[in-house]
Amino acid sequence: MYNQRTISVCIIGRPNSGKSTLLNRIIGEKLSIVTPKVQTTRSIITGIITLKDTQVILYDTPGIFEPKGSLEKAMVRCAWSSLHSADLVMLIIDSLKPFDDVTHDILDKLRSLNIVPIFLLNKIDIESKYLDDIKAFLIGNHPDSLFFPISALSGKNINGLLEYITGKAQIAPWLYAEDDITDLPMRFIAAEITREQLFFNLQQELPYKLTVQTEKWEDLKDKSVKINQVIIVSRASYKTIILGKNGSKIREIGSKSRMQMERFFGFPVHLFLFVKVHELWENHPDFYQYMKI
């Protein structure tokens, strides 16, 4: 215990910049869902990795953007609130895109909070015409900051980043067991897995403004688990899309979700999906509490 070190790290950035992919890469498990949809991550996802005497606690956060509706505003508030519990803040930047006004706003707010982030220039495994300009801007405007060119997808330079992070850890007791990878409840993880499969299998047919709740989790005598989940949408037409012809689409989504759950949890799962229409669910705080935002 006396040799234990601990550090908490917050990962922030624009939507689809690679935050969730980075978290999954570092902990070695697909914990945070990743889809082509923007604003996939809605709440703070905690990932944990213990390397020798050092425990690293990572916070994957919702992407920061210009919010409009109630859900989007809650997500952005959630992202900024995560900074207060972190020892180190990493701002991940998509090197395939130029700096935009939102990125500059993020930098301005960090400066106003007296936070000096570590800059992660992500997606360097793909040639970018913007990378040199991004580096020049950071060197010219943030000369005291460190930046790491990385690829969260391929793992390039991730070991070097981890060496830096662990080197900043302070002597403190671990907060979690050595083999823990998250503190999220299994019910929440199961709901996230189903939400990911909804986005992957419906793609542009369905807006991201749906939510999934695990209503029942029953441990059975044969060591398997029965899970009942409800998919909540705002329109009856979305329910029709999710169900598919004669229920074919929801069966496909359920099958893929079940397989992902069994791989992640390590035990057999009996998954039952239901769809409910709740027109104004975004205006009800109970849903935000369940989503942890």
Curated annotation (Swiss-Prot):
Topology in membrane: Peripheral membrane protein
Q: What does this protein do?
A: An essential GTPase that binds both GDP and GTP, with rapid nucleotide exchange. Plays a role in 16S rRNA processing and 30S ribosomal subunit biogenesis and possibly also in cell cycle regulation and energy metabolism.
Gene encoding it?
A: era
Q: Where is this region: G5?
A: 150-152
Q: How does it assemble?
A: Monomer.
Kindly state which keywords UniProt assigns to this record, in alphabetical order: Cell inner membrane, Cell membrane, Cytoplasm, GTP-binding, Membrane, Nucleotide-binding, Ribosome biogenesis, RNA-binding, rRNA-binding
Gene Ontology CC annotations of this record: cytosol; plasma membrane
- Region G4: list its residue ranges: 122-125
Q: What is this protein called?
A: GTPase Era
Keyword Nucleotide-binding listed? The answer is: yes
**Which positions does UniProt annotate for GTP binding?**
13-20, 60-64, 122-125
Question: Which part of the chain is the Era-type G domain?
Answer: 5-174
Family stated for the protein in its record = Belongs to the TRAFAC class TrmE-Era-EngA-EngB-Septin-like GTPase superfamily. Era GTPase family.
Cellular compartments annotated: Cytoplasm; Cell inner membrane
Which InterPro entries does this chain map to? G_ERA_dom, GTP-bd, GTPase_Era-like, KH_dom-like_a/b, KH_dom_type_2, KH_sf_prok-type, P-loop_NTPase, Small_GTP-bd
UniProt region (G1), positions on chain:
13-20
Q: Which superkingdom does the taxonomy of this entry point to?
A: Bacteria
First-listed, main subcellular location of the protein, grouped into a coarse class: cytoplasm
Region described as G3: 60-63
Q: Where does the UniProt annotation place the signal sequence?
A: none
User: Pfam families recorded for this chain?
Assistant: KH_2, MMR_HSR1
Please name the GO terms that the record assigns under molecular function: GTP binding; GTPase activity; ribosomal small subunit binding; small ribosomal subunit rRNA binding
The KH type-2 domain is annotated at 202-279
**Region described as G2:** 39-43
